[in-house]
Amino acid sequence: TKYRFVFYARPNNLRNLFYLGIQVINSAIQQQILNLDQWEIIFVGKDIPDVTIDDGKEPIKYQNLNWSEYAQLAGTVDLGLSLMCTPHPSYPPLDLAASGAVVVTNRFSNKQDLNCYSANLICADPELHALVDAIRKGIALATDPVAREQNFINNKLSTDWNQSLKDVIQVLSTNY
């Protein structure tokens, strides 16, 4: 079975850096970092155009998934590439890390390091060479089941709504 590489692909949302992501994937393939004999390439998002990756193959595309389909897919991902030119991490990197995947994302403004959530989240500067190097690191981590699982076990991503909303509920119940 092949490992699963997922790219969060939203070309009509410029903040998602779709075309940089395509360059990163192609460069990683050209440099034999991302070996298509070992990795299945999947694009997930909306309005994904017909594209071919470096070797002329078309990626598998999933568009407009409902939440159940998205959650089911997230649980099968080994490595994700999710770019977002915003100061917040966005949902896909956190969703994928919470599902056990390793994720490469970009730095921006105050978003420099996401280890506070998970050691399976790798941040790199939003430029080709830095992101390709992060893909290299991501592949090494995604294919190391012991390190990847240990990072997942040590995730600081809360799955308990009561815990997550505890402070908010406290403030609201005290002030209102």
Label for each model-derived stretch:
Residues 1-67:
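Conserved catalytic-core segment of nucleotide-activated headgroup transferases in glycan assembly
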Residues 83-93, 107, 112-115:
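Nucleotide-sugar-dependent
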Residues 102-106:
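Short hydrophobic beta-strand element within catalytic cores of glycosyltransferases
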